[in-house]
Amino acid sequence: PFAQTEPQFLSDAVSLARQLRSLSYVELRELWGCSERLAAENARRVRTLAEDMAADTGALTAAVMAYDGIQYQHLRASVMDERQLSWLGEHLRIASGLYGLLRPFDGVVPYRLEMQAGLAVDGARNLYQYWGGRPYDALCSGRDVDTIVNLASVEYARAMLPQHARDAPPHALGTGPQVVTCLFGD
């Protein structure tokens, strides 16, 4: 599958990319908490990240193909037929520290930015404050959503789902969709 759409929060992602670019290599490595090799590779990416995001959507990677966590490995979008990909486009949303919330075929560039990273930007102390409730609002707006199946890690669910949605028992009545959280373990 190829990238077909622009991320909804692209201008916010560009702001984050510019903030990353303003950091020194030492600050970036500390923010990422990664090896020297990964830090060097990603520091090079950061220098052109904002500009790379502005590329023609068709030249970018579809979000569903860009990540390699266990959820994406088992999803196997690369072997889906057109009907399955269409369903995926309507129902799947991807939490991202850089892009906020992505649809499967939004065009993305390679980056490193975990949701729990302590990146201060635009008056927010961290990415949780920066994104606030916007990803959840986008997830639920314009569609008839009665259930969210949450495959995200705790760190990403914290950013994407309001506290009441994360903590409510499955049978609870209230505002917003029911959230079913899947736990992954060895």
Question: What is each model feature region?
Answer:
Residues 1-113:
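Near-N-terminal "mature-domain entry" segment
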Residues 77-186:
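Internal, well-folded beta-alpha domain core
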